[in-house]
Amino acid sequence: MMQEFYASDAVSTNGSLEIFEADINECISGSAYLEGYVIERDDTTVGYGMLARSYSTEFGKPCVWIEDLYLKDECRGCGLGTQFIEYVNGLYPNALLRLEVEAENDSAIRVYKRCGFDFLPYLEMKK
């Protein structure tokens, strides 16, 4: 599923098997930074989510990044994305939730806005 997600238009990088393996190993190692979740419907795996924990000096509180949120095509629009975000809110009720979304991903943007997210007015950079 990670390969499907990173090959989709929802992500601007393609990832690699090496990165996917490192991500999964980090999740199952009991990492303080990364958590992985399997999303199921009717006892079938239909998606996954990954959360990264940090602290936001900008907002003065713990921060949880929704790094990945992927649902198979046939399960989009069924409320599972909203349920996952509500679950994360319940796990981290006092944390700032952040995520990235491609500007063209209108359906995801609608879900995130309904869940209370809004846009920040700056660009993200990496090194």
Specify the residue positions occupied by each region the protein language model found.
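Conserved beta-strand in the GNAT
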Residues: 36-38, 44-53
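Glycine-rich acyl-CoA binding loop
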Residues: 39, 77-82
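Conserved active-site alpha-helix within GNAT-family acetyltransferase domains
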Residues: 82, 86, 103-121
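Conserved donor-binding loop and adjoining core beta-sheet/short helix segment
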Residues: 49-63, 67
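A short helix-loop-beta-strand connector motif used in the catalytic cores of GNAT acetyltransferases and
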Residues: 26-38
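A short, internal acetyl-CoA/4′-phosphopantetheine-binding micro-motif in the GNAT/acyltransferase core
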Residues: 66-76
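Conserved GNAT-fold acetyl-CoA-binding loop/helix
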Residues: 3-26
